A protein has these predicted regions:
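Conserved NTP phosphate-binding and transfer environment spanning the P-loop NTPase/kinase superfamily
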Residues: 2-23, 29-44, 51, 199-307
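Post-Walker A helix-loop "phosphate-sensing" segment adjacent to the P-loop in P-loop NTPases
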Residues: 106-118
Length: 307
């Protein structure tokens, strides 16, 4: 472990794994296969060495937060509304954010102090395609201006104000759009994980969703590796989800390998890589914890901000 001269403590994977202590493994291989995303390699050892120690750390933070509320209630002489602990997870497209969010949701829900853990992706707060097309920014989908930032902030602010019932919009990856007639209901969770590309954004004036986070994670990797993962995922989707006639990207289903790779490379270079460098990568240093992945999608180093 080192971290001299930086606001972070830096751990090798082995050093981080040792911090698991006696935390029990509560997931088996079937659970992990169910949780992991498309083209994301995730083993039992990865969960044991990386995510169990992280769940232990988060459990300690959540317990401390709960104890602080108890102290405040004692001071005020009356109980206050229960407020969830909010964790943000950021990083590029195809870096594995969603898989990490689901793993943490499962692990954290198995701790006795906070059995209710909800997961919300910011995709639901994208403007509908019709709005993006009207504004001429459909090609900027996923960039900060394509999100209903105020709606997202209102949602998280409602959570942190202790409202007993909060609703979030629902996004369909098949339709590649927000579903106008569906809402996700969240009722009195102990923890809420919010996962999205730009959730650590905080430049300029005004409020940002990251202002409401109690803990934040940035999933980091070499951009060349992320591009490879994106292309591999595109090829897998071509052979699976894109085959559905109702899929927004059904037009890609009949591409051969060379055509699919060329199209995925174009999309990466023109959209996702630009978004990474312009809007996502610079938010890395705002995270409480950084998970650094290697080319095989496995976490090689962990950086924890000094508190």
């Amino acid at each position: 472990m080192n971290g001299d001269g930086t606001p972070y403590l830096d751990f090798s994977r082995a050093e981080w794994a040792a911090l698991r202590a006696a935390t029990p493994m509560t997931l088996d291989e079937r659970d992990i296969d169910r949780i992991k995303g498309i083209n994301v390699e995730l083993s039992v050892s990865e969960v044991e060495q990386v995510y169990l120690p992280l769940s232990r750390l988060l459990n300690l933070y959540v317990r401390a937060s709960q104890q602080l509320f108890t102290v405040t209630d004692t001071f005020l002489g009356k109980p206050s509304d229960r407020v969830p602990y909010v964790i943000g997870i950021a990083g590029s497209v195809a870096v594995g954010k969603s898989t990490i969010a689901r793993i943490l949701q499962e692990l954290l829900a198995n701790w006795p102090d906070h059995p209710s853990v909800d997961l919300v992706t910011t995709d639901g707060f994208l403007y509908r395609n019709a709005v993006l097309e009207k504004r001429g920014i459909m090609h900027r989908k996923g960039f900060p201006e394509s999100f209903d930032r105020r709606g997202l902030i209102r949602f998280v602010a409602a959570l942190k104000s202790g409202q007993p019932r909060v609703e979030a919009p629902v996004y369909s990856h098949l339709a590649y759009d927000v579903l106008p007639d569906q809402r996700r209901v969240i009722e009195r969770p102990d923890i809420v994980i919010i996962e999205g590309l730009n959730v650590l954004q905080g430049r300029g004036t005004g409020s940002y969703v990251s202002d409401f986070f109690d803990f934040s994670i940035y999933v980091d990797a070499d951009p060349a590796d992320i591009e490879n993962w994106y292309i591999d995922r595109f090829l897998t989707l071509r052979d699976t989800a894109f085959k559905d006639p109702g899929a927004y990207f059904h037009r890609y289903a009949d591409l051969d390998d060379d055509e699919a790779r060329a199209e995925a490379h174009r999309i990466w270079k023109e959209i996702n890589e630009v978004n990474l460098y312009e809007n996502i990568l610079h938010t890395r240093e705002r995270a409480t914890l950084i998970l650094k992945k290697g080319s095989a999608h496995d976490v090689e180093r962990v950086r924890l901000r000094r508190r």
